[in-house]
């Protein structure tokens, strides 16, 4: 009985481990999506994020696919040194989240 329980538990773990809710997209995939018109240009997305925090500089960007949607994440540092995380819908260009990095 213990073997059966262990087998069921291991099988359940293997099945759920395969589900990933967010997938990082590499540069080649990101450029392909941009060129196909699936996502906004990176310049436009960066401009939208920077407009939210004038005077900031971009420190990092990342494109992910989350729950079937393309999300562009931008990390900013403002003039006071405060870091911000801005997430945009990469297809529509709308800001989804904007919060101070803690």
Segments from the language model and where they lie:
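Long, terminal "pre-/pro-" and other extracytoplasmic accessory regions
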Residues: 2-102
